[in-house]
Amino acid sequence: MSPPAGGAAVAADPASPVVLLAVHAAVRPLGAGQDAEAQPRKLQLIADPERPGRFRLGLLGTEPGAVSLEWPLEAICYTVRGPNQHELQPPPGGPGTFSVHFLDPEEAQQWAALVRDATAEGQNGSGSPAPAPAPAMCPISPPCSSMAQIPKATQPEVDLPQSSGNFKKEELATRLSQAIAGGDEKAAAQVAAVLAQHHVALNVQLMEAWFPPGPIRLQVTVEDATSVLSSSSSAHVSLKIHPHCSIAALQDQVFSEFGFPPAVQRWVIGRCLCMPERSLASYGVSQDGDPAFLYLLSAPREVSGQSLQNSKMDRKLGLFPQSLGLPHDLQPSSSSLPSPSQPGWSCPSCTFINASNRPGCEMCSTQRPCAWDPLAAAST
């Protein structure tokens, strides 16, 4: 069965364009008379892949053998007759006006708002003002004859209707996730293109199921980065963590359990200085007993007359050898600290204090600064 004039038949293509919204309704041709039975149809609004900045409205059959039609949005007239009742008029030469009945008034309102805003976006892109609505109707879309066609090269990018708000952005983000998980490269590229056109900020993360199971025990060696006696001024703790947790979450956990702010924490795992946004698993943490190193920096004093609370925090942060005012779980492994024989050099990357004769950092392998003079450091 060939489609009626004015509408293009829709092929069952699994890599279909981006669908902004799809709703179900009972559709009946008005020219068929009152006795004609309404048929279940699916209406969908999609971004036109061949004309950036434009949309298409599809009327899809839900039963075997039903003809599915699709028109450019600017070529149709869409009228709201009531909370549940709408009318769809295709361009001249088409199948005639359809009566569209929604079961859910909220769904009908959401659909009408999306069509209205998408139509407005198309008008802004074409540069043609929208004609005034007829007194007896509430047209959402202007008559097709009033729409001026413009060259494809001057058409704007696809724009998301404003009234749909974050709901549509979240729906597109969900579609992107589903397309990637299903291996649908074309659909993922289309959705990603729409999101990129609107500079939508996304937080792309792996699901927890892709990480090693947890919780596990992370063996942490705590060092005072301000002390030259790193080998003698260490403490050891065991933290219960999940491999999917980020370094930032680990810093917050240490702050919650021991009182050390994230700003003074430097984590080194697998000879790498850890970045807050990366996961523990990305540094190879996957099982009980995996090692990690935590270096604590001295917090700078804001003013000379700081509060008593800040003074207490300074004493807690000045771990070794200035004071031993540590939480009970972070007591140094050696209670008597020997006097320093000579100062070492501080790694510019992870702040680890290395022995003066080491050419590179013991923790992260960063090369020793060329300007560091062991003789001058020893004299001070």
Curated annotation (Swiss-Prot):
Database matches in Pfam families: LTM, Sharpin_PH
Phosphoserine carried by residues: S163, S307
RanBP2-type zinc finger span: 342-371
Example GO molecular function: protein-macromolecule adaptor activity
UniProt pathway: Protein modification; protein ubiquitination
Subcellular location per the Swiss-Prot or TrEMBL entry: Cytoplasm, Cytosol; Synapse
Domain remarks in the Swiss-Prot or TrEMBL record: The Ubiquitin-like domain is required for the interaction with RNF31. The RanBP2-type zinc fingers mediate the specific interaction with ubiquitin. Binds preferentially linear polyubiquitin chains and 'Lys-63'-linked polyubiquitin chains over 'Lys-48'-linked polyubiquitin chains. Also binds monoubiquitin.
Name this protein carries in UniProt: Sharpin
Gene: Sharpin
